[in-house]
């Protein structure tokens, strides 16, 4: 059986979808879509021409599409109608609205979150994974000082991070550990230093165990981004079992409330949150680390990802 996976470039999920089908003994072929380069009419025509050529040559038994762009979904439903034996799976990977009439043509629908499922009728939630397992953790948290961790990302709300850290530093000595690089990092570091917060820049730490050593020193990860959904940084915080200060709406916000894995924060309450975490006990923070570990193992492991994909079995 031949599986063709169509995914956006830099997809969090396609690697694991491919590994899943390969583990079942299926032949897997990948088609990648650069979603940022197919906006113009002529770019779409060119891409669809190449796609038709590839699908005709491959003649797949199942198409798994994780790039849910309307024009692409429309093309795949046309292909399915012309090839009755092919099975079609749509995976709505982003919290974006897609045309339900195309989704209805699929044999199976996945979506990336509960908030996404609210407008994706008939979908099963398939949470992303980073493929890692939680390591043993030995937190060594200071009572006198607050330590934060920030994973570098172009979507970081840097001004909000600085504002929040300023409030915390008024009440308690603070240090920010930074992992990774992004374009404006040096400017951001200077802004953080200017509000009286110490900075330790680890740059890129490739080893999971080395990153865990950093997380074990930190009270909270700063998940403050101009982003919707669960991204790789959120998964890294979860796997690292570090509670989060979170500004991302949707499922993460709900997890913070229901699983007590951290604090939701916005422009209205960030001063209150800063005051609360500066006053809370280490027991509260240690319990949140346990909650984060349990949450990750419940929803975000590779085993759980594969288990959810098993539900396609009836469509094959």
Question: What are these regions, as identified by a protein language model?
Answer:
Residues 268-273, 282-316:
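A charged, aromatic-enriched C-terminal amphipathic alpha-helix characteristic of glycosyltransferases
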Residues 110, 139-169, 177:
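Conserved donor-binding/catalytic core segment of Leloir-type glycosyltransferases
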Residues 4, 53-72, 86-89:
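Short N-terminal targeting/anchoring amphipathic segment
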Residues 14, 47, 62-83, 96-98:
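An aromatic- and histidine-rich active-site surface loop
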Residues 32, 97, 104-137, 151-152:
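Donor nucleotide-sugar binding/catalytic pocket of nucleotide-sugar-dependent glycosyltransferases
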Residues 186-209:
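Nucleotide-activated donor-binding/catalytic signature segment of Leloir-type glycosyltransferases, i.e.
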Residues 1-35, 108, 166-171:
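N-terminal subdomain of nucleotide-sugar transferases
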Residues 213-229, 242:
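Acidic donor-binding loop of glycosyltransferase active sites
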């Amino acid at each position: 059986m031949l599986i063709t996976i169509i995914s956006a470039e830099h997809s969090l999920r396609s690697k694991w979808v491919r590994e899943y089908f390969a583990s079942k003994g299926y032949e897997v072929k990948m088609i990648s879509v650069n979603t940022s380069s197919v906006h113009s009419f002529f770019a779409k025509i060119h891409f669809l021409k190449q796609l038709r050529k590839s699908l005709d040559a491959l003649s797949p038994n199942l198409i798994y599409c994780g790039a849910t762009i309307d024009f692409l979904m429309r093309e795949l439903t046309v292909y399915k109608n012309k090839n009755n034996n092919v099975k079609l799976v749509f995976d709505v990977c982003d919290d974006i609205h897609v045309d339900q009439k195309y989704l209805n043509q699929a044999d199976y629908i996945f979506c990336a979150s509960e908030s996404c499922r609210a407008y994706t009728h008939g979908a099963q939630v398939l949470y992303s994974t980073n493929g890692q397992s939680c390591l043993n953790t030995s937190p060594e948290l200071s009572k006198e000082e607050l330590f934060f961790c920030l994973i570098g990302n172009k979507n970081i709300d840097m001004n909000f991070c600085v504002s929040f850290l300023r409030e915390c530093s008024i009440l308690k000595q603070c240090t920010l550990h930074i992992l990774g690089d992004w374009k404006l990092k040096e400017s951001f570091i200077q802004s953080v230093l200017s509000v009286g917060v110490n900075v330790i820049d680890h740059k890129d730490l490739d080893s999971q165990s080395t990153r865990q050593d950093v997380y074990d020193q930190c009270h909270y990860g700063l998940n403050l981004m101009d982003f919707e959904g669960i991204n790789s940084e959120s998964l890294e915080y979860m796997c690292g079992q570090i509670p989060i200060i979170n500004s991302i709406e949707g499922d993460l916000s709900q997890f913070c409330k229901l699983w007590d894995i951290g604090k939701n924060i916005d422009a209205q309450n960030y001063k209150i949150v800063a005051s609360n975490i500066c006053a809370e006990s280490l027991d509260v923070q240690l319990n949140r680390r346990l909650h984060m570990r349990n949450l990750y193992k419940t929803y975000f492991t590779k085993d759980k990802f594969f288990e959810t994909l098993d539900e396609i079995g009836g469509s094959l």
